[in-house]
Amino acid sequence: PVGETTLGRISNVLGEPVDNPGPVQSNTIFPIHRSAPAFTQLDTKLSIFETGIKVADLLAPYRRGGKIGLFGGAGVGKTVLITELINNIAKAHGGVSVSGGVGERTREGNDLYMEMKESKVINEQNISESKVALVYGQMNEPPGARMRVGSTASTMAEYFRDVNKQDVLLFIDNILRFVQAGSEVSALLGRMPPAVGYQPTLGTEMGSLQERITSTKEGSTTSIQAVYVPADDLTDPAPATTSAHLDATTVLSRGLAAKGIYPAVDPLDSTSTMSQPWIVGEEHYETAQGVKQTLQRYKELQDIIAILGLDELSEEDRLTVARARKIERFPSQPFFVAEVFTGSPGKYVSLPETIKGFQMILPGELDSLPEQAFYLVGNVDEATAKAAALQVEGQ
C-alpha cells in the first residue's frame, strides 16, 4: 500500500501496519521492485538545501534532490544527527517525508516515533494530516526483510514523487545494515564471498537501491542516509561503495566526539559536489575555503605543538592556532532533539548567519573573545553574549 493513508503510520517490509490504529485503507498498491527512472526523466537543477546545522551548510552543503551520507563509527552521533535533520527539515519543509529504519535498534525507532508525535509531525488526533510515513525492518527481523525494507521505503517515496508530484525527503538509517543483510542472504544462497566477507553482488545491490532514489521532472527526492563505518575504516567495501552514489558526505570523527564537540562533523573529511563558487556563490565558497585552510594548517602544526609546545611557534602560527581553535568550536551547536540530555534549547542557524560568523573569526575580528565562548552556541551574536557572561563570572 502507498499513498496518503501510509502517513503517520509504521509499516513493515510488506507494507502491513505494525502500530495500533488498524489496517491501512489504501486502494493503490505498488510492487517494491521497480526500475529506476530513465535518464531523460531526471532533473538536473542545482540548488542548496539549508539544514540549520552550521558545519553542514557551510563546508559540505546538501543538494536539494540529492543524496547525502552521514558516515561514522559506533557512538559518534549518526542517529542523533539524522533525527535532528528530520526535525529541522520535516518541520520547515512543507512536503512529506519517508523514514526507513533498516536493521537498526528498535528502541531508536520507537524514540523517533514518540518524538514525531510530540513535535506534531505525526498528528495523532487527525492522522491524515501527518507529514511522515515510517517503514521499519529492525535488527530482530530476518535478513530478507532487512534487505528489502529500503526498497519498501523507496516505493512509498516514489508514489509521492511521481503520482502526487511532491518534493519528498527519504531518510534511511542505516545503509550498512542493508549491506549486512545482503551478505547474510548471499551466504544462505551459497555464494562465494570475496575479500572482507561481503557478498559478491554488493555493487549491484547497492546500485539497484540507490539509482531509484533520484529527482525527476515530476518531483524531487532528497535522501539522507546514515552509514555505519565498521572499525572507523572508510575504505571498507560497504562505506566505499555507498560514497560513490552520494552528492555530499558528512563524516563524523571520533576525535571531535572525544573533545565533546557535537555534531562531531570532521570539516576536512566532509565533501560536497555543491561546494563550487558558481553554485553557492563566491562569498560562501571563499569563507568555506578559508575555514578549511586554517584548520589544515592547525592540523599540520599539531605535531610541533605536541613535541615543542605552543611557545616555539612563530607569532603568525600562534594566531592561526588561536583562530583555528575558535573555528573548531564554533561549528558545535545545541540540537533540538538533544534538549532532554543537554538541558540547553536547540538552535537553528540560517546560512547567512553561519557565513557571517566565520567571516568575523577568520580575519581576527573576534580575537579578543575566549575560545569557550564559541562552544555550543548558535550564531555569532550568542558567542559574543556568552563571552560577556564568562567575563562577568570571571570577575
Curated annotation (Swiss-Prot):
Its EC number is 7.1.2.2. It is a peripheral membrane protein. InterPro entries: AAA+_ATPase (IPR003593), ATP-synt_VA_C (IPR055190), ATP_synth_F1_bsu (IPR005722), ATPase_a/bsu_AS (IPR020003), ATPase_alpha/beta_chains (IPR050053), ATPase_F1/V1/A1_a/bsu_nucl-bd (IPR000194), ATPase_F1/V1_b/a_C (IPR024034), P-loop_NTPase (IPR027417). It holds the Pfam family ATP-synt_ab. ATP binds at G72, G73, A74, G75, V76, G77, K78, T79. GO terms for molecular function: ATP binding; ATP hydrolysis activity; proton-transporting ATP synthase activity, rotational mechanism. GO terms for biological process: proton motive force-driven mitochondrial ATP synthesis. It catalyses: ATP + H2O + 4 H(+)(in) = ADP + phosphate + 5 H(+)(out). It is an enzyme of class 7 (translocase). Produces ATP from ADP in the presence of a proton gradient across the membrane. The catalytic sites are hosted primarily by the beta subunits. F-type ATPases have 2 components, CF(1) - the catalytic core - and CF(0) - the membrane proton channel. CF(1) has five subunits: alpha(3), beta(3), gamma(1), delta(1), epsilon(1). CF(0) has four main subunits: a(1), b(1), b'(1) and c(9-12). This is ATP synthase subunit beta, chloroplastic. It comes from Microlepia platyphylla (Plate fern). The gene is atpB.
